[in-house]
Amino acid sequence: MAKPFDISKFRKNLTKNITGISTGFNDPDTWISTGSYGLNFLISGDFYRGVPMGKVTVFAGESGAGKSYVVSGNIAKAAQDQGIFVVMIDTENALDEKWLKNINVDTSEEKMLRIGASMIDEVAKIVHDFVTDYKANHLDLPKEQRPKILFIIDSIGMLDRKSVV
């Protein structure tokens, strides 16, 4: 019989050597409604919960199916209603401030940051820099005092690599 693998030393070194890394499970404590009871239920098993904070959620579908409306509209608005700051990365340069305001999304600097980017490397750097800054300024706070941030990338499918352009 093989000797059981002892992961405790690896886990201890991992968490000691890499600041901010965690091991184990991190179940969501915050959910953001999609604005549709049916879609909420399909995603979370609950009519009132939609997408979980702290997890990656991807909406896929045909052009014109309403993905941008659900995510950039309903989910962004629901997040703002819960005090969550929205970082919206627009890869198609298609988000219209008037449209967002018409569906009650607050586009003020206090509630939302809209960034236009079209390259995978740009989006990776934006997210990396944002997370690095967030950790530097908020990681020492108790979890419940840290500001909550929602990243929306509309749309991942439109991102290009430098070598393609």
Spans of model-derived segments:
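The Walker A/P-loop phosphate-binding site
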Residues: 2-110, 122-132, 136
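Short acidic-hydrophobic, aromatic-tinged amphipathic segments that line or gate anion-handling sites
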Residues: 110-118
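Conserved ATP-binding/catalytic motifs of P-loop helicase motor domains
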Residues: 136-143
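Walker B catalytic acidic pair
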Residues: 155
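Residues immediately C-terminal
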Residues: 158
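Conserved small/polar residues in nucleotide/adenosyl-binding loops
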Residues: 164-165
